UniProtKB/Swiss-Prot annotation:
InterPro entries linked to this entry: APS_kinase (IPR002891), P-loop_NTPase (IPR027417)
Any one GO biological process: sulfate assimilation
Keyword ATP-binding in record: yes
Protein name: Probable adenylyl-sulfate kinase
Length: 199
């Protein structure tokens, strides 16, 4: 879709830096990516809880939850997956512009799509977190029973089974969820954010 020259951008009266100053912290997106069952949502919510306890303005966008509303019109074909991530990238940008920390938990299987979202943000506002977990461990966990359905042919285009997952080449963080507890993984991320002066 091309840009319509008749639609004009209206500048905000209050800047992002003003909102960050009011909140007492910087804003950024923590983009959790990994296979289904790797622990993205659980880890994102654990980080969110720790941020909340520190008085940080934060919010989690979860891949499943978003498909109940904003993206309920999208399926799992390649084009729909791309649009799913594009929309979330734009929503995440709005949150960051509002001065908040936004945590997104989406499989987001394609590098090109994740790079597309990264390009929306200046350096230091987008952090890719690879929640790494072997496929066989994710299948053993199978919290939603989706791997079993995919193996039985009941679900098509399922990431890791009949649709690829492209692991990040240079993520900002790697949390190996089969070797690191959720609490320890969340602490690693919180400590890194503090060391970088984000919070």
């Amino acid at each position: 879709m091309t840009h319509n020259p008749n639609i004009i951008w209206h500048p905000a009266a209050i800047s992002k830096s003003d909102r960050q100053s009011l909140n007492g912290h910087k804003s950024c997106v923590l983009w959790f990516t990994g296979l289904s069952g790797s622990g993205k949502s659980v880890l994102a919510n654990a980080v969110d809880e720790k941020l909340y306890r520190k008085g940080i303005q934060s919010y989690v966008l979860d891949g499943d939850n978003i498909r109940h509303g904003l993206n309920k019109d999208l399926g799992f074909q390649t084009g729909d997956r791309i649009e799913n991530i594009r929309r979330i990238g734009e929503v995440a940008k709005l949150f960051v512009d509002s001065g908040q920390m936004i945590l997104t938990a989406f499989i987001s299987p394609f590098r090109e799509d994740r790079d597309m979202v990264r390009a929306l943000f200046p350096k230091g506002e987008f952090f890719e977190i690879y929640v790494k977990c072997p496929l066989h461990v994710c299948e053993q966990r199978d919290p939603k029973g989706l791997y079993k359905k995919a193996r039985n042919g009941e679900i098509k285009h399922f990431t890791g089974i009949d649709s690829p997952y492209e692991a990040p080449l240079s993520p900002d963080f790697i949390i190996e969820s089969d070797q690191t507890s959720i609490s320890d993984g969340a602490d690693l991320i919180i400590n890194a954010l503090q060391n970088r002066g984000i919070i």
